[in-house]
Amino acid sequence: MLRSNDVHCTPVILSTPEQTPTHRLGSYYLETGYGIRASKVTYDRKNSAITEFDFDTIDLKGLLEHFTWLHLSGITPALAPNCRKLTMECLKTARELGLTVSFDGNFRSTLWTWEEARDFCTQCLPYVDVLLGIEPYHLWRDEEDHSKGDVKDGIPFQPSYEQQDEIFQAFIDRYPNLRCIARHVRYAH
């Protein structure tokens, strides 16, 4: 489909994927909003091929060694424990191979809890070069004493640019591997 629409997609691995004949393709359904009714997305991924696939059969080094950049989304690890394992292995392998790694937390409340997302995504940070968004990540003021709170505690949902700069600097201080942080800014009217 990409090539037929003149989307440049080289290099994309086009070899035959592993087959999982007993599992279906995951999907999602978008109910487009109208007027004051917001759009709604329903994920149908439980027991889908990706959630049941044995990722230990993949040679990640062989798969990634020809690339310079790996982008991962926080949606994949939200799908199932094996997907979390795959995401972490991809991060570690990419770091080992010297790839630039970008990561977008993409929190989806219908796929996992806020705390699950924060705990897992925070574990990803030491392997990330380009971070998209500042949530969902823990940024404890004191790594030993979490009762002192998160740097982001008390910051409004739509922080000012000055507050964002303070948070971004705290991330860079804590994770010097981060070369770039970008935050999504979206306003609903």
Residue ranges and their predicted role:
Residues 1-74:
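Conserved N-terminal subdomain of the carbohydrate kinase-like
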Residues 105-111:
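A short, histidine- and acid-enriched strand-loop-helix "catalytic/donor-clamping" loop
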Residues 3, 92-96, 125:
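Anion (oxyanion) recognition and catalysis
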Residues 97-105:
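Short beta-strand/loop segments at the ligand-binding rim of alpha/beta enzyme cores
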Residues 9, 101-102, 132:
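Hydrophobic beta-strand scaffold residues
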Residues 97, 111-189:
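Conserved phosphate/ATP/ADP-binding segment of small-molecule kinases
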Residues 14-16, 74, 105, 135-136, ...:
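Short secondary-structure boundary segments
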Residues 58, 84-89, 114-122:
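Charged helix-capping and loop-helix junction motifs
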